């Protein structure tokens, strides 16, 4: 008798995706982040659902409702901080997942890569709107500053901003629609994740060597299920350490003050995971130029498959490209640091140089180094 797992229409899909999936035998811990991102998404949807049961999206009561969740709801403080720090864990996993893709040349799977970039944009939009919901000082001013960037669009900019706001400033209408979008987007993200996996399973996983691994495949279960469980345990451990010992480590103290349109915080800055893009935005004196640089800092990821000039897929055997890659990582860390600093000397010039270096590495240095390596290997 054939196994139900292999014949039942629904169980068959799960079987081909998570149990009998042929996987390369040599994928390292860098391949764990896909499953960790799935876990993060589940945690965020569940904690978010329970928060939404007690939250009110009204300017008068939003801040108080978050306070009520933390003080009066059973384990409300735990749910709230798991959701806030879960977002940070989500972005840590996202950045490492994208970094892995860049290092090992996984971007040569066009469809999977491009869906991944759309996912990155969607998650960033969701996180931004979620940050507005507690209606603290940084929520309000962050929303004002970031939505205002759209006014840089010629001709329709101002109208567009007022349309998004639902009025002449960030107010009740803005908060209500942001809550609605923040609620629906994770489900859209879930659908996109399924498409992401669908395209991935068309080609099979890449592996550290970048070579075709069809001749040496092993079943996903039990080998990679047990490996994923280790990653999951470490992720939960890290998240709970953050939540239970220093829940406000990555937050902004200004957000514990209710939103006040009449008083601007001394330094308006987004959450840490947007600081690199914020630094690039601020490094250009022109408003429209800054907005374009901000968008292209993420969109540039779509060019990687076109800029891949090396004859080898992975960077595993390309020491020169490895050096350039780690300089890019250091540059992104520098941009993250600069994004959190005030706009004054020497931070301005450091930010500008780091921004130039970021685009130069991706568009110029990495492709050039790849060609040099080809020549050195007489390819």
Curated annotation (Swiss-Prot):
Functional note: Component of the ubiquinol-cytochrome c reductase complex (complex III or cytochrome b-c1 complex) that is part of the mitochondrial respiratory chain. The b-c1 complex mediates electron transfer from ubiquinol to cytochrome c. Contributes to the generation of a proton gradient across the mitochondrial membrane that is then used for ATP synthesis.
UniProt keyword Transport present: yes
Extra information: Heme 1 (or BL or b562) is low-potential and absorbs at about 562 nm, and heme 2 (or BH or b566) is high-potential and absorbs at about 566 nm.
Family to which the UniProt record says this protein belongs: Belongs to the cytochrome b family.
Cofactors named for this entry: heme b
GO annotation, biological process: mitochondrial electron transport, ubiquinol to cytochrome c
Protein name (Swiss-Prot/TrEMBL): Cytochrome b
Chain ranges passing through the membrane: 33-53, 77-98, 113-133, 178-198, 226-246, 288-308, 320-340, 347-367
Annotated GO MF terms: metal ion binding; ubiquinol-cytochrome-c reductase activity
Binding site for heme b b566: 97, 196
Residue positions binding a ubiquinone: 201
Gene that this sequence comes from: MT-CYB
